[in-house]
Amino acid sequence: NSPGEQEDKCYTLMRGLVEIHNDSFVDDTNESLGNIEWRKVDLYYSNKMGDKLVKKVESVAYSKNTSLERIIVEQLIKGPGDSTMNSTLPSDLKLLSISVSDGICYVNLSSSFLTEMVNVTSEIPVYSIVNSLCSLGNISGVKIMINGDSAKSYRESISLENVLKFNSEVISS
């Protein structure tokens, strides 16, 4: 690669990345920087014991073409980037689709949500997603689907058939 080609690649890469507080990045190569908005959000990760959620406030960047709900779930998949907290979701989990209708957020995840285990109690991964999304204010409940199917249960203990609401009992006090 010539220096000019390297500069072009570097410029293209830098143009597409917006740095977020905790040194994680959102790849947004199709958007001009003028369309980026910032918002503080509550993300719920696991405590070190894996039995409670811990709130982490982060500033996230998102574009008008990428929903804030999508950014939140993608950040949860990336993990906390903080040694005092643990991830709640498998790192290879894919968010297949996400939408909001009448205050309900519909989250469609890949099957690794059910098959890949993280070292936390059963309600932690589910309520990490639910509590983080419900904290936005415009979402009253979350419906989790696996490959489009909602007739599933998580670790045989939490039914995903119903809309789930914010759960304060799983938050560390």
Language-model features: where?
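Bimodal "functional hotspot" detector
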Residues: 1-173
